[in-house]
Amino acid sequence: MDCPNMPLHINRRQMLLSAATAAGALALGPARDAFGQARVQITEGNVAPLPIAIPNFVAGTPSDNEVGGGVAQVITNNLKRSGLFAPIDQAAYVEKITNIDVPPQFKSWTSINAQALVTGRMTRQSDGRLKAEFRLWDVATGQQLAGQQYFTSPEYWRRIAHIISDQIYERLTGEKGYFDSRVVFIDESGPADRRVKRLALMDQDGANVRYLTRGSDLVLTPRFSPSTQEITYMEFGQGDPKVYLFNIETGQREIVGNFPGMSFAPRFSPDGQRIIMSLQQGGNSNLFVMDLRSKSTTRLTDTPAIDTSPSYSPDAARICFESDRGGKPQIYVMPASGGQAQRISFGDGSYSTPVWSPRGDYIAFTKQGGGQFAIGIMKPDGSGERILTSGFHNEGPTFAPNGRVLMFFRDPGGNAGPSLFTVDVSGRNELRVPTPGYASDPAWSPLLS
């Protein structure tokens, strides 16, 4: 079922007109041993996906059947793509859920090896709103683990499905989910020698694609603000490339400063009050930070080298960046206010496009060497380097809001164009992200507010 076009920015207050904990449900929180088998143990090694059953949500009226099926399918797809869950085919179900207020027949679900069960209901209200309810059950113990109800406009059913997915993920793993989020990326179309690039926005699963620019000018390196309401990006228009600020809610944009020379790789600070970027002056590229309120600019590096691709740590105390000051591109870390930079990458090849995890535990990067482009992670001190995926041309990693999944783009070369992929920080579960056309340079938003 397709979801109707949604406004570019809808916050939870606008969308969820009210929400309440369902009767008898436990308060949401970290998973506990008392949950029995319905628990996903997340480690850096292999994880056995948790078998989970997700029947179509019960419809309050026949006209809501399609919505109920659509919500269940989105939840199923989200959990399956995470690699931590193994949704059971509905054809194997023994019991048909018709009333979520009555406990399920748990023997019917243990017989198909389900360890967790999700039940739900979609009901149209007299005022036109849609009431969405769900329950999460531990099949082995018969314990209800979570339950919530939401009231929203019918066109936002897909977002409700993402929010419910996050609730299930958090309850069964003990970690925050990442499904109620968006990705901004560069949509590419046309032949390789006349490629048209547009700024585009979509849900993290590839749905609800919106085009934010027309494609008349080249756009690159879009990045979200912490509020998810603004995007900063680079555009090659008339003259030197400039850094722009785009408001998703209003569709308005403005130039971030009017700097001489070229500006590159803009990114927001964690509080959203500053933008850090690389400015080219006199053949060198150095890092600068601009205060968005005062428009004042502070220089952070001053070297006869190319310093670019800066990214803040989550606490805004440090930045990582790419520099060729040592001869070839490597990753450096320094205080966010400037000062002594410490090199942290020492493997063979060159390193680029570093980005700090929202959890603060890893820095992701692109590594080039031996004719291959790899996506990897390392700890902020440079230890524990791990290659997650490699190929002819992989580039541009970006972290999911919970820091457990990376998205990047892969370009096979030739006349074919790039595509988006996701991979777990353990290097498992590499999956292609569906997009209408070619796609590159993704940036993952925080969880929507």
From Swiss-Prot:
Its main location: periplasm. Pfam families: PD40, TolB_N. One of its GO terms (cellular component) is periplasmic space. SUPFAM superfamilies: TolB, N-terminal domain, Tricorn protease N-terminal domain. It comes from the Bacteria. Residues 1-36 form the signal peptide. It is found in: Periplasm. InterPro entries: 6-blade_b-propeller_TolB-like, PD40, TAT_signal, Tol-Pal_TolB, TolB_N. Keywords: Cell cycle, Cell division, Periplasm, Signal. Gene3D superfamilies: TolB, C-terminal domain, TolB, N-terminal domain. The keyword Signal applies. GO terms for biological process: cell division; protein import. Part of the Tol-Pal system, which plays a role in outer membrane invagination during cell division and is important for maintaining outer membrane integrity. Belongs to the TolB family. The Tol-Pal system is composed of five core proteins: the inner membrane proteins TolA, TolQ and TolR, the periplasmic protein TolB and the outer membrane protein Pal. They form a network linking the inner and outer membranes and the peptidoglycan layer. NCBIfam families: propeller_TolB. This is Tol-Pal system protein TolB. The lineage of its organism: Bacteria, Pseudomonadati, Pseudomonadota, Alphaproteobacteria, Hyphomicrobiales. The gene is tolB.
